[in-house]
Amino acid sequence: PERLAELNRITTPYIRAASLAAIRAQSACPVVLYDAPTLFEAGADDFCDAVIAVLAPHDTRVSRIIERDHLPEEAARARIDAQPPDSFYRAKCGYIIENNGDLDTLYRDTDALYQILMK
């Protein structure tokens, strides 16, 4: 944990600056999506107009990681357990997409949120 904290202390300012430059380069776009696993830890949420979390049940996430990344179950669970709990995202994010169905449902929910954000 100490070495990771030191690595984050060194790299976060550079990652933040590069991310902000990339976002600003898209200023003509009506929406810019910024996928950042450490958004809040890096303080990058302060340059976001809206923050969206996409959440799924724990077991669903485990099986998706195993299938996508070909990891053993223990590694998939460890990856999830290293992340903040869903309650953290529910408290911090303005919008939540519940990704507990099929892709059609996810697309429908994402499009509905897009329509809200574009108003």
Located regions from the model:
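Conserved phosphate-donor/acceptor-positioning beta-strand/loop module used by diverse small-molecule
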Residues: 33, 45-69, 97
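Small-molecule kinase domains that catalyze NTP-dependent phosphoryl transfer to phosphate-bearing small molecules
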Residues: 15-19, 28, 46-47, 67, ...
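Conserved nucleotide-binding/hydrolysis micro-motifs of P-loop NTPases
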Residues: 39, 57-60, 102-103
